[in-house]
Amino acid sequence: MQQVAIYRNLQKNCLSIQSRERENYGKIIGYCKSIFLKRPKFVVREKGRLRVLKEGRKNVHAFVVGRCPDLNLWSWQDRDIKMGGNPTTKVFYDPYKYSTFVDKDGNPVYKARAVLVNTNYIQADITKEN
C-alpha cells in the first residue's frame, strides 16, 4: 500500500495523486476521477485557506491523505456505497465556510476508517473503531 495525498485539480477537472512516500514525497504520480483510501486523514493547511479568503482565489491547501491499496484506479457512479458493511457519510470542504472538512451537519471530520474520494464529493466511513 502506498501513502498518498489526494486533492481536487481544478485545472484538469480530476483528482491529483501526490506521493507521500519518502523517495517521491510531493511528486504527482497520477490523476483519476475517484480513488479509495484506507485510514485517511483530512488535512487543511490554514495558511493556504487564509490566502484563499484574502485573494478570493483557490489554491491547493486541502488534502485527503491515506493508504491506497491499489493504484490501478477505477471510477464509481454517484451512488451510496457501503465500505466494509458500514454506512458512509458525505464529507465536504469549503474554505469560505469552514476551516476543516465537515459532514452534512457541519461537524468537523479529521479522519475516517476508509474513504472514496470523487471529483464531486467524498464518501467516508467515519464509524468509531472498537
Predicted segment positions?
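Structural detector for short beta-strands of small beta-barrel domains
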Residues: 2-9
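Short aromatic-glycine-enriched beta-strand elements
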Residues: 13-16
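Acidic, low-complexity, intrinsically disordered interaction modules
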Residues: 18-117
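Cysteine-centric segments in proteins
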Residues: 121-124
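Short acidic DE-rich linear segments
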Residues: 127-130
